A protein has these predicted regions:
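Conserved alpha/beta-hydrolase
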Residues: 37-68
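Alpha/beta-hydrolase active-site loop
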Residues: 72-92
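Alpha/beta-hydrolase fold nucleophile elbow
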Residues: 93-102
Length: 102
């Protein structure tokens, strides 16, 4: 699915096959990765009772709007704003404890 923090198109992987979730793990991937890389991790933690959410940073994988790997001048500020937006989305939708990994 896509979320739109500050009109940026950010792809979000959501692995939610949990009947009675204990919490949500929000993954913040590294600079040379994407959220999909954590699929096996997500399936493991789904079996343990956790929903797993990992977005693609702006300019990465499915969040590319212009050039792949493009990092705007204030790129790290943008990443931080996007992650906070996603954390707030998780709080609003799931109302469960969140562990942030990354």
């Amino acid at each position: 699915m896509y979320l739109y923090p500050n009109n940026r198109k950010i792809f979000v992987n959501i692995w939610d096959t949990v009947a009675n979730p204990k919490g949500v793990i929000q993954i913040i991937h590294g600079m040379s990765e994407c959220g999909a890389r954590y699929e096996q991790f997500a399936h493991y933690f789904n079996l343990k009772g956790y929903i797993v959410i990992a977005n693609d940073h702006y300019g990465h994988n499915n969040s590319v709007e212009a050039y792949f790997g493009e990092l705007p001048k204030e790129g790290f500020k943008i990443f931080a704003e996007d992650e906070l937006f996603i954390t707030n989305y998780i709080n609003e939708v799931y109302k469960l404890p969140i562990h942030i990994l990354g």
